[in-house]
Amino acid sequence: MQDLKEQFSTYFDTGDDKLDSVISLFDKKHLNKGQVFIRQGDICKDLAFVKQGIMRVSTVINGKEITQWIATKGYYITDLAAFITGGRSRWTITALNNTTIYSISKSDYEQIGKIIPDWNIKEKQFITHCFTILENRVLQFLSMTAEERYLHYFN
C-alpha cells in the first residue's frame, strides 16, 4: 500500500502515524476485466484508488452507452455525489482490464475525520483539485478532436 500512502501524502499533509491509520482503512482488491465495482442504481458505498489498471465510468441513455470518465493508475474513483450523500449511483464503474484497487467503505471513510482533526478542510481542498481535473477534461472534450483527446490522455 506504499503507492496509496505516497499518493495520499501528496494531497494531505499529516503525520506518518495518522497517515498509516488512514491507509489501514483501505482494502486491496483485484477486479477482473469486465467486473463491476459500482453498478448504476445501487447505493454507492465505496470509493477506490486505482493502483493498476483502467476503470470506466459509464451509463446508458436512450439505449446508447456513454462513457463519462476513464480512471487509470493514481486516480480515485466513485460516484462522488452518491458516495457523499449515501444515494444511488448514476454510473456503472467497470474494470476495463485486470485492475487492482484500494477500496474504502463509506463507514470507514467517515472515520477519517476522527483520525485527522482538520479533515473537512483537507477533503474540500482535494475535491477542489478533482473538480479542476474534471473542468480541464471538459475543456479538452470541447476543444480537441477525438484523436487529439486519445493521444493526449494515453501518451
Feature-to-residue mapping (PLM):
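Cyclic nucleotide-binding regulatory domains
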Residues: Q35-N97
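Polybasic "coupling" helices that flank or enter modular domains
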Residues: T94-N97, Y102-N155
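Conserved hydrophobic/aromatic beta-strand scaffold that supports enzyme active sites
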Residues: K28, I70, I101-S103
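Short, flexible turn/loop "capping" segments at secondary-structure junctions
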Residues: K29-H30, F131
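Conserved short-loop catalytic and cofactor-binding motifs
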Residues: E6, G41, V138
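Cyclic nucleotide-binding regulatory module and flanking cytosolic helices
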Residues: M1-D27, A82
